[in-house]
Amino acid sequence: MYKNLVAALAAACCFLPISSHAQAAKAPAATAPVRAAFVYVTPVLPAGWTHQHDEGRKAVEQALGQGVRTTVVADVPEGADAERVIRDLAQQGQQIIFTTSFGYMEPALRVARDFPQVRFETITGYKRADNVATANARYYEGRYLAGVLAARMSKTGQAG
């Protein structure tokens, strides 16, 4: 999952405005860091779904260093409050917003329509837009292993 977050943030950098050719002749200015926000459905605890997303956020910071500045808003209920928080982050100038709960998909899509310059990544969502992408875990890998284990534990060597 960390690789996916780093890749998504790196891809977002490709969509950011590039300075004009005329400005290239001037002395190179320091590039402002990408502003990335993460919206969590629960507080960050020692383990669990939100903890893993926060580990991914930390990996992004480690990989990109001064090239990224992250913001976290935790314990955001799904629904109207989620839309308010996501909209507020977009208004603050966040360039990419990761929403880490299925219930954030619709609010993120509504906010994305009003902020086409902001990129959104909805985790476990399935609806996309020009500035909204989706990501998900590879659940099938764990399910496959559970099936193999179930078959090996059965008397017949078959699951089911």
Residue positions per predicted region:
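Flexible loop/hinge segments that line or gate small-molecule binding clefts
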Residues: 113-136
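Positively charged n-region of N-terminal signal peptides that target proteins for export
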Residues: 1-4
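Short, well-structured alpha-helical segments in soluble
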Residues: 79-93
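Periplasmic-binding protein-like
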Residues: 93-101, 121-123
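Bacterial N-terminal signal peptides
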Residues: 7-17
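Hydrophobic alpha-helical segments within soluble ligand-binding/sensing domains
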Residues: 135-157
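Boundary at the C-terminal end of the N-terminal hydrophobic targeting segment
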Residues: 20-24
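Extracytoplasmic "Venus flytrap"
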Residues: 35-56, 60, 71-82, 102
